Amino acid sequence: MLNIYNVNSLVHWEERDIKLRDDFVRFFSDEVANFLRSANAAWDVRRVEAPTLMPRSLVSDAYSNSDIWVQERMSNTETELVLRPETTPSTYAYMQHLLGNHSRTRLPLCVWQAGRSFRREQDQPSKHVRLKEFWQLEFQCAFTADSGNDYHAAALEPVRRMIASVIHLPARTVPSDRLPAYSEVTMDIEVDNGDKWMEVCSISKRTDFPQRYRSQPKKGPAIDHDVTVLEIAIGLDRCVYNWNIAASR
């Protein structure tokens, strides 16, 4: 991780770290899919890539223009675009597309992305890894709220072990110090890198999926369900950074 520009929170990544990040994406995505399907073989797990530019209207109200990178509009008719602060809205849009296009896609459905996101983070030393441009690996795992399965609680220890197994630092699960409005509960996974316990992953039970899900039993009328989303959000840059700390010891 090189600060060549001499601008806090803007870094270059060299080939070794890029390959390591790619390895993390492969391993983590395989492990999450295996965990979900071991809990319920019906899970449909898919990957998608969405543009890093997105309509401003899709960004959560929790982000003001001072938090994100907004494109200047050249005319009043031009769609206001921003560099995405997270992958979730574009993943949700794809999930709605799948569920609404008569493709017989059903819940439970997990869609994940690995890619760059952008936020106007306050300038901090690089060791805190609060970057203005950063890599996220985010899984949105949607299921009916009345399913009776607590996938959030079931995911905590498998995800902690998964991360600890590759970063090779002590890892713990703690309640998040912030609870987003969209979440019933959020837990963080932190690793001890010798300088601090650093958050590398958050696991939330989200209630903000944009639509209800309609199932059609073999007999009787269709049933509308509320949708709950298990979100597993992993900071890939922080995983690479902490892996390098462990490897240097």
Residue ranges, per PLM feature:
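TRNA-recognition modules of translation machinery and tRNA-sensing kinases, especially anticodon-binding
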Residues: 1-249
